Amino acid sequence: MGQDFSRFRVVDMTGELGPYTAKMFAGLGADVIHVESPAGDPLRRVGPWFRNQPGVQASLPYLYYNAGKRGFAVDLEHEAGREVFRTLCSGADLLVESCRPGYLDGLGLSYEELSRDNARLVQTSVTPFGRTGPLAAYPGSDLTCSALSGFLWLAGIDGDKPVRAPDNQAYRMAEAYAAVGSAIALFSAQRTGKGQLVDVACIEAEAMALENAAQFWDLEGKIRRGRGREAGSATLHPCADGYIALVAIMGRNKDMWTPFVRWMEAEGVEEWPLFDDDKWIDYAYRTSEEGYTTFCRVFERYTRSRSKAELYEIGQRFNVAVTPVSDGRDLLANPQLAHREFWQTQFNDTLGADITYPGAPYEFGELQWQLGRNAPRIGEHTREILVECGYPAFEIDNLLRMGAVYAEQH
């Protein structure tokens, strides 16, 4: 497939679910066309908002996930709009969509129909439960996928209710898998001249993130949950400006525990000799009430007087697995991310201000990832894309009058 992604045209018909898949192609230089209805992508109505002011161009998730794309507005409920969409796909390499299974088929826009016009077309469908099976037609959300996949249960701790991780983790996992699957299918289409349908289900993508929960049940008959506060040597601890995460020992690994003891000794931590005892190698003791309270009493007396950055720097010197629990402000100031130029600031002419975005999720040797243009306004590039598709000016005007498409007025 080579390294020049600019040869690919991607039609992105996603909303709250799926936009990151197409964004990953946009970042590598592909021509990504974000297709939405004239009423606008539902993601435009999702906060948080730029300077806390809601608006169709002020949704921060929309601005991030659709940066690098061009905007095209079409009404698929309109017969002429469906023909326009079909024409658009006839010149595309990849269609990424997150429609309810059966919706496009009912409009005469099934993969079978679209691939008749373009045998090389790859269509990637990203849905909550996949395109087949008893749940395929059910409505779903990130929350329902996280619940059904087991992710919520695993995130909780014994004796407490399930816990939802922040943001839409099921969606993001599915989008990453969809990008990989799409790239593989594109590679195949370039070799064989024949595209294929890629079916990605959020519930399956998130089930891949359950660590060894399935093995616990298979091998030991146990339903695993989060560790919670069971071991002070492997949990969160408060410090002067927040929290740190510590893993001082795993299993019976004394070689992992010894550096932690040396750290406590070197710092002159009050009662540190309590840690210089092989009973801490015993998992049962570490997770006992005595082990937990003793560890937290001694260690947190030390951590509460120091910053998380200081604890991180000192702990790393002793080869102890300790790290700050970062908030958004910490991430923006993180020197590692700054060195790798992860944060990308770009002026948004619609909002009249600079906006800082997360940057490349990967680095290549010669292929440079790019943030690209600002996320499009509704119908911002409709006219120019129709011209590229071969529509003459009078026909474009007619489509606009009919309401089959919408174009931003200049």
Curated annotation (Swiss-Prot):
Statement: the UniProt record of this protein carries the keyword Isomerase? no
Which family is it part of? Belongs to the CoA-transferase III family.
Q: Which InterPro entries match?
A: CoA-transferase_III_domain, CoA-Trfase_fam_III, CoA-Trfase_III_dom3_sf, CoA-Trfase_III_dom_1_sf
GO molecular function list: succinyl-CoA:(R)-benzylsuccinate CoA-transferase activity
Pfam families xref list: CoA_transf_3
Q: State the pathway, as annotated in the record.
A: Xenobiotic degradation; toluene degradation
Keyword presence, DNA-binding: no
Bilayer-crossing regions:
none
Catalysed reaction(s)? (R)-2-benzylsuccinate + succinyl-CoA = (R)-2-benzylsuccinyl-CoA + succinate
Protein name per UniProt: Succinyl-CoA:(R)-benzylsuccinate CoA-transferase subunit BbsE
- Described purpose of this protein according to its UniProt entry: Catalyzes the reversible conversion of (R)-2-benzylsuccinate to (R)-2-benzylsuccinyl-CoA. Inactive with (S)-benzylsuccinate.
Signal peptide position in this chain?
A: none
- List, in alphabetical order, the GO biological process terms annotated in this UniProt record: toluene catabolic process
Q: What is the lineage of its organism?
A: Bacteria, Pseudomonadati, Pseudomonadota, Betaproteobacteria, Rhodocyclales
Keyword terms: Aromatic hydrocarbons catabolism, Transferase
Report the induction information.
Answer: Induced by toluene.
What PANTHER family does the record tag this protein with? BLL6097 PROTEIN, SUCCINATE--HYDROXYMETHYLGLUTARATE COA-TRANSFERASE
EC number of the protein: 2.8.3.15
| Top-rank taxon | Bacteria
Activity regulation: Inhibited by (S)-benzylsuccinyl-CoA.
What quaternary arrangement does the UniProt entry report? Heterotetramer composed of 2 BbsE subunits and 2 BbsF subunits.
Taxonomic source organism:
Thauera aromatica
